[in-house]
Every structure is written in structure tokens, then in C-alpha cells.
Amino acid sequence: AECKVTVDSTDQMSFDTKAIEIDKSCKTFTVDLKHSGNLPKNVMGHNWVLTTQADMQPVATDGMAAGIDKNYLKEGDTRIIAHTKIIGAGETDSVTFDVSKLKADGKYMFFCSFPGHIAMMKGTVTLK
């Protein structure tokens, strides 16, 4: 099983995938986030954040107040399973997390916590 995925983000407020499947044989899983757009991170920054489906909106709402220096995520938020930093045009960041943090029957979402982006920039994470 390939225990990693590359996710591209754009100036059109989109990720190039809406669903990520993680093989349960993976001990860790890595997400490489790219930004193929032209706009800087203060204008069109993106990150990749993993939470349960139930926690997604509250985490994003709390994150807005945190500001860009904190990657639009509340510091020490235990609801966040994994996240990258906010990146802009031409930048990349990656995050590796422990697959044991996910339950087989759990509902998980990935999203961008940059203010206003969650409506367009989200998808499911499934343990298979």
C-alpha cells in the first residue's frame, strides 16, 4: 500500500482531490500539500487539516480568530488530528501522522482552514 498522497491546491480555492483512502496496513500516512497557483499565502493561502467530521466546522471557526501566523488554527487544539502550515504560490508542506489515531468506522474530513475556504476545500478521509 502507498502510505502517502500528494494534494494540490489552487488559486481557484480547490484541492485536486475530494477523497483520500488510507490503507489500514499503513503505520503512518503522509500528505504532501502543494500550491500550484500564483497568489501569495496572505491572499490565497491553503493548508490541509484533518479532523473528525463533527469537529471540522468548530475547528475552522475557532481557527479564523487565530490568524495567519498560527495557520488559522487554535493553538493546542486537541481536535486536530494532523495539519500542514498555510502555504502560498509555489510552496509545499507535508505532514505525517500516526494511522492508529483513526478508527475504522470513524468519519473524517480534511479541509483548508483559511477563512472562507472550507465550503469549497474539503473532502473525506477513509480508513480501508
From Swiss-Prot:
One of the record's GO molecular function terms: electron transfer activity
Cross-referenced SUPFAM superfamilies: Cupredoxins (SSF49503)
Primary localization: periplasm
Disulfide bonds: C3-C26
GO cellular component, one term: periplasmic space
Reported function: Transfers electrons from cytochrome c551 to cytochrome oxidase.
Stored InterPro entries: Azurin (IPR014068), BlueCu_1 (IPR000923), BlueCu_1_BS (IPR028871), Cu-binding_ET (IPR050845), Cupredoxin (IPR008972)
Superkingdom, taxonomy of origin: Bacteria
Residues that bind Cu cation: H46, C112, H117, M121
Species assigned in the record: Pseudomonas fluorescens biotype C
Domain Plastocyanin-like: residue ranges: 1-128
Protein name as annotated: Azurin
Record CDD domains: Azurin (cd13922)
UniProt keyword annotations, A-Z: Copper, Disulfide bond, Electron transport, Metal-binding, Periplasm, Transport
Compartment annotation: Periplasm
Record carries keyword Lyase: no
